[in-house]
Amino acid sequence: RAFARLGEEGIDLFMADSTNAEVPGFTPTERNIGPVIEDVISRTKGKVVVASFSSHVHRVQQVIDAAAANGRRVALMGRSMVRNMGIASELGYLNVPQGVLIDHKKALKLPDDQIVFMSTGSQGEPMAVLSRIASKTHAIEVGEDDTVILASSLIPGNENSVFRVINALIKLGANVVHKANANVHVSGHAAAGELLYCYNILQPRQVPVSYTHLTLPTN
């Protein structure tokens, strides 16, 4: 309704993201992800490591809720993850049940079936927590009975880095769950249906924003 009112007033410029302009339909809701993460955690006998963007507060909230529902505690791993979630908690955007969050050093002493590690490194960054786990240079060790969830999309250009991490984790014996084999992430970019809807109600003189010339004509 707010967009429609703006359209009635007249829009000269609408900056539109073209990343998913070639994806038909509408981007699925984030609500679909929580039950999938909870199911994966419930079926894991050992430890769970979830890697996502350190700024994705809602994804971390879903992991915390899923861990709590399965009687597990959560340790935040990675400086940016700890910092961002600390700010989110202070501002009231992240709701953590009492006793669920635990210091990472104490988490390492818990039985594997009682802990979820929420980490950075979903894009294969070499010095991030997940890459160090995969290369066996981190205190967290994964193997059989353990599950690693990559709750993110591949950013173009990071394919080789991410696949390298996934292969290393599988080689260690871990079960690796990612967007290609489970519904553990939805895009934050508007698909074709949403873009068309916005253009129809706003009718702007628009200037699309694009990463590549591939998606620009579609938008």
Predicted regions and their residues:
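His/Asp/Glu-rich metal-coordinating catalytic cores
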Residues: 1-109, 128-141, 160-164
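Generic beta-strand/beta-sheet core signal
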Residues: 17, 51, 75-78, 118-120, ...
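Glycine- and other small-residue-rich loops at beta-strand/loop junctions that grip anionic moieties
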Residues: 25-26, 51-53, 184-188, 209-210
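Redox- and metal-dependent alpha/beta enzyme cores, enriched for Fe-S-associated oxidoreductases
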Residues: 153-173
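Generic long, charged, amphipathic alpha-helical segments
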Residues: 173-188
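Conserved small/polar residues in nucleotide/adenosyl-binding loops
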Residues: 212-218
